[in-house]
UniProtKB/Swiss-Prot annotation:
Residues 99-190, 196-282, 300-385, 390-474, 480-567, 571-660 form the Ig-like C2-type domain. Glycans are attached at N138, N196, N397, N449, N540, N779, N816, N931, N1002. It is found in: Cell membrane. The keyword Ribosomal protein does not apply. Contactins mediate cell surface interactions during nervous system development. Has some neurite outgrowth-promoting activity in the cerebral cortical neurons but not in hippocampal neurons. Probably involved in neuronal activity in the auditory system. The keyword Metal-binding does not apply. This is Contactin-5. Expressed in brain and kidney and at very low level in placenta. Not expressed in other tissues. In brain, it is highly expressed in the occipital lobe, amygdala, cerebral cortex, frontal lobe, thalamus and temporal lobe. Expressed at moderate level in the cerebellum, substantia nigra, putamen, medulla and hippocampus. Weakly expressed in the spinal cord and caudate nucleus. Weakly or not expressed in the corpus callosum. It comes from Homo sapiens (Human). Residues 673-771, 776-873, 878-972, 977-1067 form the Fibronectin type-III domain.
Length: 1100
C-alpha cells in the first residue's frame, strides 16, 4: 500500500507541474509536456473492454457487474448451483475468479530532454486470488532483474532513465492468478525529440523575376510530428502564405509560384515539435534575382500534391495539399470525381489545402486538384480511403460447463478492413487441435474437461488496430448432492390426485436418476412415470401408493439418495349456504361454510369476494369471520352496501388438498348515476336533454329529476320539466323556464323505492339563446348633483336577466305635468346612473322618470314612473362670524356660524389656511361634513401667523368664501427639562423638588409643572399639576413607581426630566441623597439595591 501511495503522489505532482509549464509559454517544456497519454477506449485503437464482473468499493466509480456464468452448451447448470446467488458471489471472497482488467496501459510519448527521468506504464486488475503481474516488450517477457532501471509497483511498470534505443516499442501487461492469465492491449512507448539543423552554410538560390522557386527546409531528425514555418530576413518576420506563397506541412518546403523583387532576401526554416514545443532554426537560404531578364508566362506546374492514396481513420480530420508554380499565379480548384465534396469541407491557405473534418466512410473517393492560369492548366488525382478501428459487436461471457459438454464461443467485431480473429488461452495463442476448432471468430471445444478451464481472450484486429475480449471458462466436476434441493420428508395427498415427487440432485456431469419404493425399483406404467427432470409422477393416487420412496442420483464421481414418505387421504368436500340471496342496502347476512374432511387433517378457511381475499381489518367493520366449530366457519356481513354485491368464495385448505365453493349475493339499493347527459336542442328558455338509463340496483327506477347549474345559481337546482313527472322508463325530457343567454350545465338523478342515487356526470356547458329583456331596473331614484343637472339612478339588472348581447338602458324623463318623454340611451350594462344637464332647468325642479332595458333582440319593459327633483344650486351665502383661536404650538381652532338662507343646502364646510408669507392659492384645506361649526387644525408650525377662510359646499359645488381671519400659533413649550430632582420618601408618599425651568426667547412662558407617575409594568400615568417647584406624590400600592416631571406652557408640555424609580415602602425614610437609584436604567446590581432600600434604617 505504501508503494502504491508513493506512485500516486508522484504522478499527481508531475501532472501539476505539467499544467503549470503549459501556462508559461516562454519557458522550456517540463514533465508536463513529456507524457502525452492518448485517450482511447477499448473499442478504439488497441482498446480492450474489461469484462463486467462485480462492483468493488475500492475502485471508486468503476461500473461493473457480477460474472455472467451463462451456459453456452448442452447440460448447462445455473451459477446458483455453485454460489447460491450472484449477489452472494459478489460478496463472497472465498469464490475464485480470474483476472479482470480495471486499467490497461496507455500509449506514451516521452520527451528525451525531460527533467523527469521516469516512465510509468499503468496496469491494474482484480481477481481472486489476487493476480500477479508480468510485462512484455515486443512480445518478449521482460526480466525485471536484467536491468536496474526496471521496477514494478503493484501492476505499474516503471522505467528509470528511459532510452529510445533500449526502451521504445510495444508493451503488454500479463496478469495471472490460479484461474488463469489475461494479456492487455499493446501500449506504444515513443520518444519525442527534435534535433538541430546541419550547420553548413546553404547556397543562395538565384532565379529570374516571374520564375517559380522551391526553398528546401531539410528538417533535422525528429519524433513525432513537427510544424513548419519560415522566417523572412530576421525573426520574428514570418512569411505570410497567400495564393503566391505556400508552406507545405508535409515536406516543410517554401513554394513561391511567381518570384517578385520584394521576395529577395534571406529565408530561414523554423520547425516546432508538437509534443515538446521545442523550436530550431535552419541556416539562412539567400534568394536573389538573376539579371538576365524577366521570366515569360508559362502554364502551371504542380509542385505539391497529396499522395496517390490517402488513408485516414474515421472521425479524424484529413488535410490534402495542392500547390503549383506558374506565371501568372495559378488558381487552385478542387473536385470529387463521381461525387460532391462534403459540405463540411473547408478550403484553407488560398485553396491550397482541402480540409475535411470528422471524416466518414462516405467521404472516401477520388479527389482532384486543378491548377489553372491564362497559359494553361494541370491537375492531379488521388484516392482518399477511410478506415475504422475494430469495434466489438458481440463479446464473450464467462461460462461454466459440465465436464464432457461442448463449448461454443463467438465474438464479432466490425471494422474496415474487416477484422480477423485470434484466440488466446491464459495469454498464449490457442492452436487448433482434435477437440478445438476456430473459424471466423467462433471457438468450439468438444467434450470439455478440466484441462480446458482457464482464461480465454478473443483478439479482433485489422492493419490499424486490435481489441481484446476476455472470459473465464469453468469446468464443473462433482458428485451428486441434494444439499440445495431437499425433499419433503412426508408428502400428503388425497385419493385420485396427481402426485409429483421431485428429484433434482446437483452434480456434474448431470446425474442419472433411479427410483425405488421400499426395496423394489419403481416400474413405470400408464399411471407411474419418471419425468425428464428426474421427478416421479403418480396419477390417480390410491392407498396402495402409500409408502417410502427413494430417489438416487449417480454420476462418475459418486451417488446420493433422498427418501420421502407418501400418505394418501380421503378428499375434502365443502358446502356453502345460502347459494343465492337478495338483500337491501343496510341489511345483514351470515354465510355458512361447512367442510367434510379426513379427521387426521386440520382445515383452514379463506373467504373471497369477486375472486379477491377479504381484508377484515380494512373493510370498515362490515365483515367478520366467525369460527364456531372446527369444521365450519361463518362470514357475517353487516350493514351491507352496493359494493358488497357479487360472488363470495369459501376455500378450505388442508395439508393434502384445497377445495372451494361460491355463493351469489344480490344487493338492492338506490339507483346508480345515469349515463352521459346530452343536450339535444336548446332555445331561449328550454333545453331538451337525453341520457342513458341508470343501473336500477335490483329495484326498478320510479322517476328521474333534472338539475341545472349556472354561474348565477347557488349550486345545483332542480328545474321544471316537460313532462312534469319523468318516469323511470323515460330517457329524455325538456327543462323549461330557463333564463335566456345564460350558460347552463345539466345533470340527471334517478330515484327508486329504496332511495335517490348519485347524480350523473354534468353535461357540457351550453348557453341558451338570446331573447328580448323581460326584467326592468328597480329602485329608480334621484341623486344630488351640480346646478342645472338631473341625476337619475337605478339598480343595474343582473347579467342573469340581460337575455343577450348589446344590453343597455333607456332613460326617459319629463318635467312633472308635461306629456312628451325625452329618452336617452345608456350603452353600458353595468351603468347605474345617468346625468342630464340643461342650463335652463332651475334647481329642485320635479321630473317624472322611468328606466327601461334593451339588447340586440329589442326593447324590454320600463320601470315604474317615479318623481325626482333636479339638483339644487351651490350654497349662495358665505359663513359669518368666523373666528380663529390659537390652541397650542401646533393647533388653531376655527369657528363660524351656520348659513341661514341659501339657494343650496350645505352638506359641509371647507376651511382653507395658509402662512402669512404664502399666497392664498397655495392654501391647504380641511373639510367637515354635516352641521359642524368648528374645526381644530393640527400639525401647524409654532409661533407662525396663519390666515383662514371658510366656505360651504354641497353636490352642486362651493359657495363664496367668508372674510379672511388670522391667528398665530403659540410659541413652543420649554425645551429645558426640570433639573436637580430631589425626593424624599416617607411611608406611602414621596416629596419631590426641582429647579425652575427658564424658557428661551422663542419658547412660551412656563405656566406650571406636571408630575407623571405610574407603577412599573403599567402604561398609563397619573398626573399632578402644580405652579410650585415641589409636589407630593402618593404611592398607594406596593411596588416600584416610575416618576418624571415636565414644565408646561400655553405651547404645550415641555421636555421630561430623567425618570426616577421609587419603591413603595411603609416604614423608614429614604431620600435622594442616600439612594443611588435615580434612573430607570438597570444593571446587574439593581435587585440588590432594591432589597437594600426595603430594609428599615434609622440612620436615614
Amino acid at each position: 500500500m505504501a508503494s502504491s501511495w508513493k506512485l500516486m503522489l508522484f504522478l499527481s505532482v508531475t501532472m501539476c507541474l505539467s499544467e503549470y509549464s503549459k501556462s508559461l509559454p516562454g519557458l522550456s517544456t517540463s514533465y508536463a509536456a513529456l507524457l502525452r497519454i492518448k485517450k482511447s477506449s477499448s473499442s478504439s485503437l488497441f482498446g480492450s473492454k474489461t469484462r463486467p464482473r462485480y462492483s468493488s468499493p475500492s475502485l471508486g466509480t468503476l461500473s461493473a457487474s457480477s460474472p455472467s456464468w451463462l451456459g453456452a452448451a448442452q447440460n448447462y447448470y445455473s451459477p446458483i448451483n455453485l454460489y447460491h446467488s450472484s449477489d452472494a458471489f459478489k460478496q463472497d471472497e472465498s469464490v475464485d475468479y480470474g483476472p479482470v482488467f480495471v486499467q490497461e496501459p496507455d500509449d506514451i510519448i516521452f520527451p528525451t530532454d525531460s527533467d523527469e527521468k521516469k516512465v510509468a506504464l499503468n496496469c491494474e486488475v482484480r481477481g481472486n486470488p489476487v493476480p500477479s503481474y508480468r510485462w512484455l516488450r515486443n512480445g518478449t517477457e521482460i526480466d525485471l532483474e536484467s536491468d536496474y532501471r526496471y521496477s514494478l509497483i503493484d501492476g505499474t511498470f516503471i522505467i528509470s532513465n528511459p532510452s529510445e534505443a533500449k526502451d521504445s516499442g510495444h508493451y503488454q501487461c500479463l496478469a495471472t492468478n490460479t484461474v488463469g492469465s489475461i494479456l492487455s492491449r499493446e501500449a506504444t512507448l515513443q520518444f519525442a525529440y527534435l534535433g538541430n539543423f546541419s550547420g553548413r552554410t546553404r547556397s543562395a538560390v538565384s532565379v529570374r523575376e516571374g520564375q517559380g522557386v522551391v526553398l528546401m527546409c531539410s528538417p533535422p531528425p525528429h519524433s513525432p510530428e513537427i510544424i513548419y514555418s519560415w522566417v523572412f530576413n530576421e525573426f520574428p518576420s514570418f512569411v505570410a502564405e497567400d495564393s503566391r506563397r505556400f508552406i507545405s506541412q508535409e515536406t516543410g518546403n517554401l513554394y513561391i509560384s511567381k518570384v517578385q523583387t520584394s521576395d529577395v532576401g534571406s529565408y530561414i526554416c523554423l520547425v516546432k515539435n508538437t509534443v515538446t514545443n521545442a523550436r530550431v532554426l535552419s541556416p539562412p537560404t539567400p534568394l536573389t534575382l538573376r539579371n538576365d531578364g524577366v521570366m515569360g508566362e508559362y502554364e502551371p506546374k504542380i509542385e505539391v500534391h497529396f499522395p496517390f492514396t490517402v488513408t485516414a481513420a474515421k472521425g479524424t480530420t484529413v488535410k490534402m495539399e495542392c500547390f503549383a508554380l506558374g506565371n501568372p499565379v495559378p488558381t487552385i480548384t478542387w473536385m470529387k470525381v463521381n461525387g460532391y465534396i462534403p459540405s463540411k469541407a473547408r478550403l484553407r491557405k488560398s485553396q491550397a489545402v482541402l480540409e475535411i473534418p470528422n471524416v466518414q466512410l462516405d467521404d472516401a473517393g477520388i479527389y482532384e486538384c486543378r491548377a489553372e492560369n491564362s497559359r494553361g492548366k494541370n491537375s492531379f488525382r488521388g484516392q482518399l480511403q477511410v478506415y475504422t478501428y475494430p469495434h466489438w459487436v458481440e463479446k464473450l461471457n464467462d461460462t461454466q460447463l459440465d465436464s464432457g459438454s461442448p463449448l461454443r464461443w463467438e465474438c464479432k467485431a466490425t471494422g474496415k478492413p474487416r477484422p480477423t480473429y485470434r484466440w488466446l488461452k491464459n495469454g498464449v495463442p490457442l492452436s487448433p487441435q482434435s477437440r478445438v476448432e476456430m473459424v471466423n471468430g467462433v471457438l468450439m471445444i468438444h467434450n470439455v474437461n478440466q484441462s480446458d478451464a482457464g482464461m480465454y481472450q478473443c483478439l479482433a484486429e485489422n492493419k490499424y488496430g486490435a481489441i481484446y475480449a476476455s472470459a473465464e471458462l469453468k469446468i464443473l466436476a462433482s458428485a451428486p448432492t441434494f444439499a440445495l434441493n431437499q425433499l419433503k420428508k412426508t408428502i400428503i395427498v388425497t385419493k385420485d390426485q396427481e402426485v409429483v415427487i421431485e428429484c433434482k440432485p446437483q452434480g456434474s456431469p448431470k446425474p442419472t436418476i433411479s427410483w425405488k419404493k421400499g426395496d423394489r425399483a419403481v416400474r413405470e406404467n400408464k399411471r407411474i412415470a419418471i419425468l425428464p427432470d428426474g421427478s416421479l409422477r403418480i396419477l390417480n393416487a390410491s392407498k396402495s401408493d402409500e409408502g417410502k420412496y427413494v430417489c438416487r442420483g449417480e454420476n462418475v464421481f459418486g451417488s446420493a439418495e433422498i427418501i420421502a414418505s407418501l400418505s394418501v387421504k380421503e378428499p375434502t368436500r365443502i358446502e356453502l349456504t345460502p347459494k343465492r340471496t337478495e338483500l337491501t342496502v343496510g341489511e345483514s347476512i351470515v354465510l355458512n361454510c361447512k367442510a367434510i374432511h379426513d379427521a387426521s387433517l386440520d382445515v383452514t378457511f379463506y373467504w373471497t369476494l369477486k375472486g379477491q381475499p377479504i381484508d377484515f381489518e380494512e373493510e370498515g367493520g362490515h365483515f367478520e369471520s366467525i369460527r364456531a366449530q372446527a369444521s365450519s366457519a361463518d362470514l357475517m356481513i353487516r350493514n351491507i352496501l352496493l359494493m358488497h354485491a357479487g360472488r363470495y368464495g369459501c376455500r378450505v385448505q388442508t395439508t393434502a388438498d384445497s377445495v372451494s365453493d361460491e355463493a351469489e349475493l344480490l344487493v338492492r339499493g338506490p339507483p346508480g348515476p345515469p349515463g352521459i347527459v346530452i343536450v339535444e336542442e336548446i332555445t331561449e328558455s328550454t333545453a331538451t336533454l337525453s341520457w342513458s338509463p341508470a343501473a336500477d340496483n335490483h329495484s326498478p327506477i320510479s322517476s328521474y329529476n333534472l338539475q341545472a347549474r349556472s354561474p348565477f345559481s347557488l349550486g345545483w337546482q332542480t328545474v321544471k320539466t316537460v313532462p312534469e313527472i319523468i318516469t323511470g322508463d323515460m330517457e329524455s325530457a325538456m327543462a323549461v323556464d330557463l333564463n335566456p343567454w345564460v350558460e347552463y350545465e345539466f345533470r340527471v338523478v334517478a330515484t327508486n323505492p329504496i332511495g335517490t342515487g348519485d347524480p350523473s356526470t354534468p353535461s357540457r356547458m351550453i348557453r341558451t339563446n338570446e331573447a328580448v329583456p323581460k326584467t326592468a331596473p328597480t329602485n329608480v331614484s334621484g341623486r344630488s348633483g351640480r346646478r342645472h343637472e338631473l341625476v337619475i339612478a337605478w339598480e343595474p339588472v343582473s347579467e342573469e336577466f340581460q337575455n343577450g348581447e348589446g344590453f343597455g338602458y333607456i332613460v326617459a324623463f319629463r318635467p312633472n305635468g308635461t306629456r312628451g318623454w325625452k329618452e336617452k340611451m345608456v350603452t353600458s350594462s353595468e351603468a347605474s346612473k345617468f346625468i342630464y344637464r340643461d342650463e335652463s332647468v332651475p334647481p329642485l325642479t320635479p321630473f317624472e322618470v322611468k328606466v327601461g332595458v334593451y339588447n340586440n333582440k329589442g326593447d324590454g319593459p320600463f320601470s315604474q314612473i317615479v318623481v325626482i327633483c333636479s339638483a339644487e344650486g351651490e350654497p349662495s351665502a358665505a359663513p359669518t362670524d368666523v373666528k380663529a383661536t390659537s390652541v397650542s404650538v401646533s393647533e388653531i381652532l376655527v369657528a363660524w356660524k351656520h348659513i341661514k338662507e341659501s339657494l343650496g343646502r350645505p352638506q359641509g364646510f371647507e376651511v382653507g389656511y395658509w402662512k402669512d408669507m404664502e399666497q392664498e392659492d397655495t392654501a391647504e384645506t380641511v373639510k367637515t361634513r354635516g352641521n359642524e361649526s368648528f374645526v381644530i387644525l393640527t400639525g401647524l408650525e409654532g409661533n407662525t401667523l396663519y390666515h383662514f377662510t371658510v366656505r360651504a359646499y354641497n353636490g352642486a359645488g362651493y359657495g363664496p368664501p367668508s372674510s379672511e381671519v388670522s391667528a398665530t400659533t403659540k410659541k413652543s413649550p420649554p425645551s429645558q427639562a426640570p433639573s436637580n430632582l430631589r425626593w424624599e420618601q416617607q411611608g406611602s408618599q414621596v416629596s419631590l423638588g426641582w429647579e425652575p425651568v427658564i424658557p428661551l426667547a422663542n419658547e412660551s412662558e412656563v405656566v406650571g409643572y406636571k408630575v407623571f407617575y405610574r407603577q412599573e409594568g403599567h402604561s398609563n400615568s397619573q398626573v399632578i399639576e402644580t405652579q410650585k417647584l415641589q409636589a407630593v406624590v402618593p404611592l398607594p400600592d406596593a411596588g416600584v413607581y416610575i416618576i418624571e416631571v415636565r414644565a408646561y406652557s400655553e405651547g404645550g408640555d415641555g421636555t421630561a426630566s430623567s425618570q426616577i424609580r421609587v419603591p413603595s415602602y411603609s416604614g423608614g425614610k429614604i431620600t435622594s441623597a442616600q439612594s443611588t437609584l435615580h434612573s430607570l436604567s438597570t444593571s446587574s446590581s439593581s435587585v440588590t439595591l432594591l432589597l437594600a432600600l426595603m430594609i428599615p434604617s434609622t440612620s436615614w
